[in-house]
């Protein structure tokens, strides 16, 4: 696309070097068959980290849309980082995982001693302060950068023909004007999808009590739904472009009208990546969140990262390139993981029982004996983990037919 916007990012110097040279035969767009005249193109199968930021601007919202009141008027607010996540892709094994960063994480900013909320390091057109912040606090190197604003989100969702999400009950959020009145498989278009992934006061209808119940996991529940939506959107794109490089190119061209990428993430590399990851089963994609404990810093309610638990160390090792993506553990959420100051009521994973929460993972139980896990990529023995859950909050049901 002629309007493609690119930025320069810091190189991942000293990062994991796992390049496994191979080749693939180019596809002739005219016939859809392997080309017999062009030489094979080298494909980089190194596992890579993609920093994905979502920004909340008011552009591209139809003023006649039922969601315009919730998103359309953002004059004077600028663009803020509403979503921060790292997508790690391993083309060699067709594996993927996502690590999300709550925007209120209290961290050192841009390699300095000064602390602030992690989203204060965000600059849409210069991701390097955020990249430095992530490395300085979490030891994770970034290979590529993707910024998705409202326009890009709408374009991507609409380009794949909408994203289907299954619900066991009606759901709503009056703040974003989201209202799904019927249980079942619902297809989101771009604008309605925005209302869903941005929902912070997500409610579901309890038929027994005949009441609307709000997700007690608050912002972490929203993050879990964003991760689930991303997984479904990727699967929809893979399904739509399966075996057809022309459709894959069309989808990429549609997205590139609005997204901002690092200069090295060219359309050609995106097509190469799409081809290499075509067999990805997104139902196996692991999803994680940086854990933390709520606290007050002056008048600010922030989250102090909690990185020293065995489980969080094992999760970070995957994104640091010290453990194989295929060996990624499940995430064990500790009891106190909240954006609310300790002086207020804290909503934890045990606040609401699974019998009353649609799609919520069972609350942590007493710990079972742990087994040692060893990764083949290094000689280091990873800290042991025990599988309990890898998401929190009100989530869609697991319906493989809804995709």
Which role does the model predict for each range below?
Residues 88-91, 106, 110, 123, ...:
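Sec-exported extracytoplasmic/periplasmic mature domains
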Residues 72-75, 115-124, 139-144, 183, ...:
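Second-shell loop/turn segments in exported
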Residues 77-81, 112, 120-129, 147-151, ...:
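Soluble non-cytosolic domains of exported or imported proteins
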Residues 62, 114, 258-364, 382-403:
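C-terminal solvent-exposed extensions
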Residues 1-93:
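Entry/capping segment at the start of metal-dependent catalytic domains
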Residues 45-48, 79-84, 93-101, 113-115, ...:
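Extracytoplasmic
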Residues 118-182, 264-270, 280:
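Amphipathic, coiled-coil-like alpha-helical scaffolding segments used for oligomerization/assembly
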Residues 155-246:
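Flexible, polar/acidic helix-loop-strand segments at domain edges
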């Amino acid at each position: 696309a002629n309007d493609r916007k690119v930025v320069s990012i810091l190189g991942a110097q000293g990062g994991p070097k796992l390049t496994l040279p191979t080749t693939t035969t180019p596809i002739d767009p005219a016939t859809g068959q392997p080309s017999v005249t062009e030489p094979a193109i080298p494909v980089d199968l190194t596992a890579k980290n993609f920093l994905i930021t979502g920004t909340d601007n008011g552009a591209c919202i139809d003023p006649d849309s039922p969601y315009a009141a919730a998103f359309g008027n953002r004059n004077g607010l600028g663009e803020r980082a509403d979503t921060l996540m790292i997508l790690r892709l391993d083309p060699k094994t067709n594996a993927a995982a996502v690590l999300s960063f709550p925007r209120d994480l209290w961290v050192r900013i841009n390699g300095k001693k000064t602390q602030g909320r992690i989203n204060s390091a965000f600059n849409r057109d210069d991701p390097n302060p955020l990249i430095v912040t992530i490395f300085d606090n979490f030891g994770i190197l970034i290979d590529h950068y993707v910024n998705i604003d409202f326009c890009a989100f709408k374009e991507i969702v609409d380009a794949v023909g909408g994203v289907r999400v299954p619900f066991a009950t009606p759901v709503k959020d009056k703040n974003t004007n989201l209202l799904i009145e019927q249980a079942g498989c619902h297809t989101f278009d771009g604008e309605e999808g925005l209302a869903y992934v941005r929902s912070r006061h997500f409610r579901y209808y309890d038929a027994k009590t005949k009441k609307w119940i709000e997700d007690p996991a608050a912002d972490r529940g929203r993050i879990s739904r964003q991760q689930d939506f991303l997984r479904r959107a990727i699967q929809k794109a893979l399904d739509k472009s399966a075996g057809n490089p022309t459709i894959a190119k069309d989808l990429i061209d549609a997205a590139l009208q609005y997204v901002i990428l690092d200069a090295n993430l060219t359309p050609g590399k995106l097509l190469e990546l799409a081809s290499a990851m075509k067999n990805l089963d997104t139902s196996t994609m692991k999803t994680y969140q940086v854990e933390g404990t709520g606290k007050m810093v002056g008048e600010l309610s922030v989250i102090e990262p909690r990185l020293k638990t065995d489980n969080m160390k094992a999760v970070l090792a995957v994104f640091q390139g010290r453990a194989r993506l295929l060996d990624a553990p499940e995430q064990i959420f500790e009891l106190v993981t909240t954006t609310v100051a300790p002086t207020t009521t804290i909503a934890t994973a045990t606040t609401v029982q699974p019998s009353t929460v649609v799609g919520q993972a069972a609350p942590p139980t007493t710990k079972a004996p742990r087994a040692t896990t060893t990764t083949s990529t290094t000689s280091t023995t990873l800290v042991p983990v025990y599988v309990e859950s890898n998401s929190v909050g009100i989530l869609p049901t697991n319906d493989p037919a809804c995709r």
